[in-house]
Structures are given as C-alpha cells and as structure tokens.
UniProtKB/Swiss-Prot annotation:
<dbReference type="InterPro" id="IPR035954">
    <property type="entry name" value="MTH677-like_sf"/>
</dbReference>
<feature type="region of interest" description="Disordered">
    <location>
        <begin position="97"/>
        <end position="116"/>
    </location>
</feature>
<protein>
    <recommendedName>
        <fullName>Uncharacterized protein PH0533</fullName>
    </recommendedName>
</protein>
<comment type="similarity">
    <text>Belongs to the UPF0440 family.</text>
</comment>
<dbReference type="InterPro" id="IPR024502">
    <property type="entry name" value="DUF3194"/>
</dbReference>
<dbReference type="Pfam" id="PF11419">
    <property type="entry name" value="DUF3194"/>
</dbReference>
<feature type="compositionally biased region" description="Basic and acidic residues">
    <location>
        <begin position="100"/>
        <end position="116"/>
    </location>
</feature>
Length: 116
C-alpha cells in the first residue's frame, strides 16, 4: 500500500478520474511490454479503482501470466510497473493541482514512452 500524499488537489471531474485510470493502466502495460515480448505474455489484466472522497484513492491490480519457460520474476516486474504508474500519476496530479492538466498528460505519455 502506498502512502498518502497531500498535494492540494481540487475535486476532479469524472472525465479526469477516468483519464487518471487510463494513464496508470497505459504506463503499466507499456512497462510490462518493455520487459517482455508480447508473445511471452499469455494473459494480462490491469485494473484501476479510483475513489474520490476527502482523499483520492487509486488502487492498481495487475495480473500477468507467462509460460513456464519464460525466466522472469513476474511479481517483481508487476511491482516495478505499479510503482512507475504511481509515480507518473502523482506527477500528473501535481500538475492538475497547479492548474496544468494538459502538461501532466503529456508528461505521463512521455514517461510511458508514448507520444501523440
């Protein structure tokens, strides 16, 4: 479980919450496929749950199945991907708190290796 970080975030719209989940999922998927070939992944599921109350709670769950002959520590890879996603989302939220939502999305795309 990640720690609570207070950044003075305003109430977010439903679209912004969906975007945060999308950013987190994209970062995780990109990170996994930076380390594994698509042919090495039998199944993958990435779930983002967001709850906005007094705080914004983001819960990420990742499941990756690889064939037995693929020599990779899947749990470590998943942990690293989730950490990366939280870092990118935190930077994006800090930009939103400062009123720079578009720059935060661009930074998230750059950090995940994607660009428009």
């Amino acid at each position: 479980m990640r720690k609570v970080i207070h950044i003075g975030l305003p109430k977010l719209s439903e679209e912004e919450l969906i975007e945060i989940g999308d950013i987190a999922q994209r970062v995780i998927i990109d990170y996994i496929f930076e380390h594994l070939a698509k042919s090495e992944v039998r199944d993958m599921e990435v779930t983002a749950r967001i709850n906005q109350g007094e705080t914004l709670d983001l819960e990420l769950e990742v499941y990756v199945e690889v064939p037995i002959f693929v020599r990779v520590d899947v749990e470590s890879l998943i942990d690293e991907a989730i950490d990366k996603a939280y870092e990118v989302v935190e930077r994006h939220l800090r930009k939103l708190a400062k009123g720079k939502g578009n720059e935060g999305r661009e930074e998230a795309e750059e950090a995940s290796g994607k660009s428009k």
